[in-house]
Amino acid sequence: MKRILPLGLLFAFLPAAHADLAAGKRKAEACAACHGADGNPATGQFPVLAGQTARYLYLQLKDFKEGRRSEPTMAPFVAKLSTQDMLDLAEYFAAQKPRPFAFKADAARVARGKKKAEEVLCTMCHLGGFSGQNEIPRVAGQHPEYVIKQLKAFKARTRTNDAGSMTSVAQTITEQDIEDLAHYISSLE
């Protein structure tokens, strides 16, 4: 009990971080050219941020800022972000609705992708429906081009900010599996 009380007092004096959605919306204007004003990009070159878990978004912004995740396009945007900026942006994009985009999934690829997802146990982390949780991203409805890009980056170990889980899984999948998984994941809502 003597140890718990001082620890409790310490936490009582720490400032609580609260996200400001209105501030997040204003800050997101700098993101709109690539990610869309509401986190729904016009092209598969960039990820859908709308509806993504706030914790995941915050951690990715932090990783970009601190150099644990590399993407030259992101570097100038994250360089001057404060912790509060990142919290505001994460909560703003998490609160937005992902919109469907034009994508004609190949039924055979979707079936093969679903089978591969079951084999490598994707839903153990990404949950059923690939909705994500906390620091695990929502990947359902993500653009297939972006899914392919990220799976290839994990496989090539050029993206390693995942504590090793995706990097390990990616070593077990083929190029065909990557294409099939992208069709399956992109077909989900």
Labelled PLM ranges:
Residues 39-69, 75-81, 114, 118, ...:
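Gly/Gly-Pro-rich "capping" loops immediately C-terminal to redox-active cysteine motifs
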Residues 4-13:
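Sec-dependent N-terminal signal peptides
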Residues 13-14, 19:
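N-terminal signal peptide c-region/cleavage motif recognized by signal peptidases
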Residues 20-38, 101, 105-128, 143:
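Sequence/structural segment immediately N-terminal to covalent heme-attachment motifs in c-type
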Residues 79-101, 145, 150, 171-189:
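C-terminal capping alpha-helices of c-type cytochrome domains
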Residues 35, 65, 126, 155, ...:
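Protein kinase-like catalytic domain
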